[in-house]
Amino acid sequence: FNKLNLPLIIIGDGPERLKLENISNSNIKFLKRISDRKVEEYMSRCKAFVYAGIEDFGIAPVEAMASGAPVIAYGKGGILDTVNCLNEQNNEKVKNGLLFKKQTSQDIFDTISWFEDKKLWKKFKPENLHEYSLKFSIEKFINKIDFSINKAWDKFNKKI
């Protein structure tokens, strides 16, 4: 974001924060710990949520979509279960973000530059992003677990 000269807000704290603050330009703002409500407020106002990590299932990108923000993320790990990339190959899918292929600053730069140059944020409708995020709600999770348990129980009972 130093090269992009676009505003970036980093929320949270960690061992690298001071180092990052020291090498960041004035377009980058750091917020330590803020309330969940404030996080939602920031997400609802941003052009995109950038997520460069790898997790089995990252909840933060889903929370960003719930707030109406598209996701720009590294295309590995659990993010592939939640983000459908905006491109020509998947016109049938709900598009809710962009994926970069390599976990490098250059790939992030290129993807965000494309997002900005083509004004891609205009292609994402906050209400569609929110609706898609509901696939990952607690209620849906409980229903799927309940269904799986009942199915296993029925299978077990048939063997007895």
Predicted stretch roles:
Residues F1-N22:
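Conserved catalytic-core segment of nucleotide-activated headgroup transferases in glycan assembly
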Residues L18-R37:
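Nucleotide-activated donor-binding/catalytic signature segment of Leloir-type glycosyltransferases, i.e.
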Residues E41-C46, I145:
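Short alpha-helical donor nucleotide-sugar binding micro-motif in glycosyltransferases
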Residues S44-D56, A69:
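Acidic donor-binding loop of glycosyltransferase active sites
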Residues G58-V62, I79:
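Short glycine/serine-rich donor-binding loops of glycosyltransferases
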Residues P70-A73, L80-V83:
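Short hydrophobic beta-strand element within catalytic cores of glycosyltransferases
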Residues N84-S105, S113-L120:
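Conserved acidic donor-binding segment of nucleotide-sugar-dependent glycosyltransferases
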Residues Q103, K119-I160:
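A charged, aromatic-enriched C-terminal amphipathic alpha-helix characteristic of glycosyltransferases
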